[in-house]
Amino acid sequence: IAADAQQVGQIGGSLAAEILREVLHHQDRARLIVATGASQFATLERLTSEPGIDWARVDAFHLDEYIGLSADHPASFCGYLRDRFVSKVPVGSFHYLDGTRDPAEVVAQATEAFGKGPIDLALIGIGENGHLAFNDPPADFKTSATYHVVQLDEACRMQQVGEGWFGSLDEVPTHALSMTVKAIMASHNIVCSVPDERKAEAVRNTLQKEITPDVPASILREHPHITLVLDSASAKLL
């Protein structure tokens, strides 16, 4: 448990860097899932400034994206990842989810790229409603798909307004492309950064309620190699 959001990012980012360096020491390439949202600002800032990572040997994957948003929209995750990650490090490859293209086509392409090997590290957060990526409650824990099209619930859409990505609920897309819970859980390592008082109830439910699709992030308790990084605000109900 860190003091504040900035420290959450310092811890999460340096741990992610340590894992990537270790993986690259033992194998030719590393495969990384990168998350977005306000919770990841400091984590990505720290990770991209860490020394000793041969980024040319890292293949990175996009976790989720709104359907219908172009990369130049301020709330686009493509734009976020381009500005906060891809433009900062010479990553070997980055597999974007393009929200403007035919969703079925995007899902098929992303699934093929993802399926070429195991994922070494996933950087993720937890939503105010307990979602993982855009898998809102009740989440599908059973699907064997890697990516799918999901409908966003109102709590998830309101969170995006609250974080300042959109001016009103009407502006927030109703559907998105998302990596599935099963695909996230298949990662060898997970670093989950969750700062902010807004997430306190979701954190408590994740750690203390039964493991249930109604609290999608509760499934993380079944992962053997996960580090959950909180700040005093997000941990205040524990």
Task: Give the label of every model feature segment.
Residues 45-55, 137-146, 209-211:
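A glycine- and small-aliphatic-rich helix-loop capping segment at beta-alpha/alpha-beta transitions
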Residues 54-123:
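Ligand-binding beta-strand-loop-alpha-helix segment within the catalytic cores
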Residues 179-182, 186-238:
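ATP/nucleoside-binding phosphotransfer catalytic cores, i.e., glycine-rich phosphate-binding loops
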Residues 34-39, 124-128, 195:
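Glycine-rich beta-strand-to-loop/alpha-helix junction loops that act as flexible
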Residues 1-32, 104:
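N-terminal glycine-/serine-/threonine-rich phosphate-binding loop
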Residues 21-51:
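Glycine-rich N-terminal segment of FAD-binding domains in flavoprotein oxidoreductases
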Residues 117-142:
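Glycine-rich phosphate-binding loop
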Residues 133-179:
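Class I SAM-dependent methyltransferase SAM-binding "motif I" and its flanking Rossmann-like core
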